[in-house]
Design a protein with these regions (language model features):
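Alpha-helical ds-nucleic-acid-binding substructure associated with the helix-hairpin-helix region
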Residues: 1-71, 122
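C-terminal accessory module of base-excision DNA glycosylases/AP lyases that mediates lesion recognition
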Residues: 36, 60, 75-145
Length: 145
């Protein structure tokens, strides 16, 4: 969907997204709810309520807390934005199915929440690297791959 948005809709800036016809957004594969949420988020960024500069200055958990105030953005989405868009080094999302599957493959069993939290502390400040490794394991990769 992101590829179609970039190819068919032009720059994905808040101002430009607000200028697009709602049905053009839908035609890129977005549900009505997602198209509406994207427009609402664009409004909040365009009117200055959301400042990308501020997001870069906040701690990781503060970024997640701020992002989940956007309609349609839950904790997992906020963590993925924190990891991939903001490029943070210490994001380990236990809400991610791939990460949980990687942990199961690594430990041979599902981990409890307490065990996952201990792992988060041990992986810090390199939680994002741990995330990439666990996704690799979940997709069938191994230590020697």
């Amino acid at each position: 969907i992101m590829g179609r948005l970039r190819q068919n809709c032009g720059p994905l800036t808040p101002e430009h997204l607000l200028s697009l016809d709602f049905e053009l957004l839908r035609a890129q594969g977005l549900s009505a709810h997602k198209a509406k949420w994207i427009r609402r988020a664009a409004e909040r960024f365009a009117d200055g309520e959301f400042d990308t500069g501020l997001l870069h200055r906040l701690e990781d958990e503060e970024v997640v807390e701020k992002l989940v105030t956007l309609d349609g953005v839950g904790r997992w989405t906020a963590e993925m934005i924190t990891l991939f868009t903001l490029g943070r080094d210490d994001v380990l999302s236990f809400g991610d199915l791939g990460i949980r599957r990687g942990l199961e493959r690594l430990y041979g069993r599902p981990l409890t929440k307490a065990e996952m939290e201990r792992l988060r502390r041990r992986a810090s400040p390199f939680g994002s690297a741990a995330s990439l490794y666990l996704w690799h394991l979940a997709s069938g990769g191994g230590v020697a791959d």
